[in-house]
């Protein structure tokens, strides 16, 4: 399918492969040499690995950098199936296992953006010895006046919402409305907290919305099914070095519950005078800070 923006393209300009996993076919990107580093994009209507482009391009000078389009996004499998927290975690686990097999089974450092921080944290708690330093950028789960609580594995899915979105093509129409070029620009301005946005990221989003089956996974995002009620408990379980960062502009600035983890010795925090994706605006500083964090000694049980 084509438009004035061209046909859907690769999320990143790098060597790309399709890996078959328990979560389906995943498009995986790789570049550079050195210790492995996995970069994970966020979840939204037009998400893809394009969201980690500045880090992927800069860090490949020092690391073997991997990124992949999560199930239902980018160039990965976008079929009509349930998109769940467990599916996202399985994708992270499977890709992580294959990366480690190519790097002498070394613990894998990883970075995640926004909601995907919850998936990464859960995957790490399921197999702690497989993971190393964790970089969480604008993580969800810390907002609100009261801690988000729930039984293990519970989600914030709105009862009946998925059924409604799958009824009579309603979800497809909602997706089409939310992914018009002008609407994508509107949401990016809210993410950046200003009029100026990254124009390439906008173009990538417009293209991502055109892929066949692009609406299926976002329906589960809209229903709340991908948000975990027990995310704060999952974050608390992490024994790895964790560097959390966020900005001060836009819609993603509420971290009132973060003290629950920031009081733990293995957690650290950086706040940038940016929107929700600091490395798109203050890339040099962010990358320097991230490299310094990744260079610190650490393993399971490490305390900074």
Predicted regions: what is each one?
Residues 119-123:
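Hydrolases whose catalytic domains are alpha/beta-hydrolase-1, hotdog thioesterase
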Residues 237-274:
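Conserved loop-alpha-helix segment in the C-terminal half of the alpha/beta-hydrolase fold
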Residues 173-236:
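Conserved alpha/beta-hydrolase catalytic His-Asp/Glu region
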Residues 27-75:
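Conserved HGGG/HGGXW glycine-rich cap/lid loop of the alpha/beta-hydrolase fold
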Residues 5-25:
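N-terminal cap/lid segment of alpha/beta-hydrolase-fold proteins
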Residues 274-287:
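Catalytic histidine-centered segment of alpha/beta-hydrolase-like enzymes
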Residues 53, 67-115, 288:
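Active-site loop/oxyanion-hole signature of alpha/beta-hydrolase fold enzymes
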